[in-house]
């Protein structure tokens, strides 16, 4: 939804040509970094168009975006529900400023009692995750099959991967062809409220 809202805003504020240029920069940066960086793309846009009088307005739009209104239905309920299984932790990829703000503004930070880690590439930081949050078994929920596959390759049977087919990445045909299916595929994040716990934890006591 943020993509549609920002597209509409850019189209109105800077015009269709510059709107398309912003998204070209955004896509290039996402390919380079591996995550969506809206402010980083705006910084690069600024270098290309340093005299654009709308830059401040676009920055204000992003910083004050109502992320809490854009969560998937029942997402916070799922976070609270997951705390019955064990400690719920947000593992996120992103920049060091905007991503933490998104997590806080959406209400997720308080829902997980501030248990949040923001990496550049979280699938490369599993040793740090294990040190901070040791467990016999992990459950990883992500809409990127690439991430789920990479973590499964490293943790093996110690992790149950869950793939909600919801969001920008979830229906990427190339990813669906390239990577193996997750341990559990669900239609939407809210489905986790009714998933039997035995499908997530292979043996009693693994929490």
Kindly give the residue locations of the regions a language model identified.
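Helix N-cap/beta->alpha junction signal
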Residues: 72, 92-94, 144
């Amino acid at each position: 939804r943020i993509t549609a809202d920002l597209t509409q805003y850019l189209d109105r504020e800077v015009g269709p040509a510059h709107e398309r240029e912003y998204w070209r920069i955004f896509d290039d940066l996402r390919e380079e970094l591996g995550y969506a960086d809206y402010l980083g793309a705006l910084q690069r846009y600024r270098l290309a168009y340093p005299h654009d009088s709308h830059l401040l307005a676009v920055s204000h739009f992003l910083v004050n975006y109502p992320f809490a209104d854009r969560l998937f239905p029942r997402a916070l309920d799922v976070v609270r529900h997951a705390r019955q299984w064990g400690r719920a932790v947000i593992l996120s990829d992103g920049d060091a400023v905007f991503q933490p703000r998104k997590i806080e503004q959406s209400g997720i930070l308080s829902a997980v009692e501030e248990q949040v880690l923001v990496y550049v590439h979280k699938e490369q930081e599993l040793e740090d995750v294990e040190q901070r949050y040791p467990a016999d078994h992990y459950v990883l929920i992500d809409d990127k099959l690439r991430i789920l596959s990479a973590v499964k390759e490293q943790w093996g049977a110690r992790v149950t991967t869950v793939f909600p087919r919801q969001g920008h990445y979830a229906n990427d045909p190339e990813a669906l062809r390239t990577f193996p299916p997750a341990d559990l595929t669900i239609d939407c994040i809210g489905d986790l409220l009714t998933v039997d716990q035995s499908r997530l934890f292979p043996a009693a006591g693994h929490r």
